[in-house]
């Protein structure tokens, strides 16, 4: 229900309003970035290590990024998890890094957004976070 309500709220906007809303939240505001390791590590060397590990994980599973997004960009992480074929793969354990980065990043993002949690984008993030947590707790991996 929460997922559909968020989609409906976003769909009620014109495409131009959707773009302005998204850009205002995530592209023009450091407080609400979708780069998941930024919150914990900002621009430290440790963040560089995480970005390199994520990139290696993508490559290990055959994903080559064609855009200039950093490896910790939430939509990229979610796309990797959604379309990856991990079931029965001995390297399945390696995708835990993606879950950890998303868990850490969305936790801080939603803490920063406490005053704006009624925004449909943050409602979507809450659903994503809860779904991924359920996957981790039950041992279910995208396939």
Task: Set out the residue ranges of the language-model regions.
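Charged, alpha-helix-forming regions
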Residues: 1-143
């Amino acid at each position: 229900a929460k997922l559909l309500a968020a989609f409906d709220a976003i769909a009620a906007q014109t495409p131009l309003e959707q773009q302005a809303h998204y850009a205002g939240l995530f592209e023009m505001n450091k407080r609400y970035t979708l780069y998941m390791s930024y919150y914990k590590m900002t621009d430290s060397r440790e963040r560089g290590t995480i970005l390199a590990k994520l990139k290696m994980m993508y490559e290990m599973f055959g994903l080559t990024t064609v855009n200039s997004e950093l490896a910790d960009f939430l939509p990229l992480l979610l796309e990797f998890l959604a379309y990856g074929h991990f079931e029965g793969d001995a390297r399945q354990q390696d995708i835990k890094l993606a879950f950890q980065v998303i868990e850490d990043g969305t936790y801080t993002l939603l803490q920063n957004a406490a005053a704006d949690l009624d925004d449909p984008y943050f409602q979507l993030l809450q659903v994503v976070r809860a779904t991924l947590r359920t996957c981790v707790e039950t041992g279910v991996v995208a396939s």
